[in-house]
Amino acid sequence: MQRLTVDEFHEAKKLPLIVVLDDVRSLHNVGSVFRSSDAFRVEAVYLCGITATPPHPEIHKTALGGEDSVDWRYFPTTTEAVAELQKEGVFVYSIEQVEGSTKLQNLSLDTDRRYAVVFGNEVKGVHQEVVDLADGCLEIPQFGTKHSLNVSVTAGIVIWEVAKQFIAGSNTEF
């Protein structure tokens, strides 16, 4: 399989998805999210609050250069990022276990829209004010003894589900 160069990646058509990290504290998780975002040609990653930003050797260790290929922005607060996205017409989902959330397997996307998905802090999840601002909430059903997944694992699962729907809806690779 032929891989894109970083320059080719920047010019390539992107998955119309922005990944938002809400106070994610682990540099490993930030790097892993960049790596998954690169794999599926995500439009951008928004890093908010205490979330670390590149360049950083610990991010690079897991991102393997994904922090160079995927566009990213920093926002002091996640509410600022969400407000800007919504102003641009982006539909924002918080990834959180809340009453009335949509199970990921029931997600049905309009492939003519842009979306954002907000992933929260490893301990506290997505801030409540961000959940309240979001246009919807998604959750990954879980059937074991634990009630959460690692944030980078969750991001990979959600990004793949969004990518699958766009691939199926367009009969192309974005």
Give, region by region, the residue ranges found by the protein language model:
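Post-transcriptional modification and biogenesis factors for structured RNAs
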Residues: 1-174
